[in-house]
Amino acid sequence: MPDGGLIIAIDGPSGTGKSTTSRALATRLNAKYLDTGAMYRVATLHVLNQGIDPADTDAVITATAALPLAISDDPSSTEVLLAGVDVQTEIRGPEVTSHVSAVSAIPEVRDNLVNLQRALADRAHRCVVEGRDIGTVVLVDAPVKAYLTASPEVRAQRRYDQDTAAGRAADFDEVLAAVVKRDELDSTRAASPLKPAEDAHIIDTSAMTMDEVLTHLIQLTEASAERSNQ
């Protein structure tokens, strides 16, 4: 495995296996892990907790300007703190999920969080960074970039399985509709639309196991390290 500084950018829509694979990859590489999607979810929860309409752009910008957020970079931890309270369960709830695209589409919100994401990745030095615009905006110089994708139906089934396993009520048709809607919102927004970086390796995980995806990512990382040593 490559030693020293290492930044791996993993992008893609929800339900592609990004989080599970990114955490496993960080563990295998003895690296830190940063879930940027969780940061936008915390911002959304903060807005909702204050009774702010996510469509009120000015109010959202003001509320998230100094977000009291702390997120673990340990790949074995899911702790996410908002004002000192662990909100890892709340940020995955249906209300946050239905509004996170609107909040994350606001350029000022993205600018604030992108600056924080860059600082955290730089401090970690060796980090797997997961999100939707890591390779295209946040860390454009990352030596390893992967874009995970899968069919909407497969991704909806995975999300449905996650929700039911966590004890959250879920309806497959509603989950599928939400997946399709968020894809459209994220890929058409003006600020940092969801799309693969030109130099990203695109991996369709529809028919792949997590171990197969992990093996592919490790091979990409090792190949990148070999090129940098030549």
From Swiss-Prot:
Q: Which GO terms describe its biological process?
A: nucleobase-containing small molecule interconversion; pyrimidine nucleotide metabolic process
Q: Where in the cell is it found?
A: Cytoplasm
Family to which the UniProt record says this protein belongs: Belongs to the cytidylate kinase family. Type 1 subfamily.
Gene this chain is encoded by: cmk
One GO term describing the cellular component: cytosol
Which coarse location class applies to the principal site listed for this UniProt protein?
cytoplasm
Q: Which domain of life is it from?
A: Bacteria
Keywords from UniProt, A to Z, are: ATP-binding, Cytoplasm, Kinase, Nucleotide-binding, Transferase
Q: Which reaction does it catalyse?
A: CMP + ATP = CDP + ADP; dCMP + ATP = dCDP + ADP
A GO MF annotation of the entry reads:
CMP kinase activity
Positions that bind ATP? 12-20
Q: What is its EC number?
A: 2.7.4.25
Q: Which PANTHER family match?
A: CYTIDYLATE KINASE (PTHR21299:SF2), CYTIDYLATE KINASE/PANTOATE-BETA-ALANINE LIGASE (PTHR21299)
Record-given protein name: Cytidylate kinase
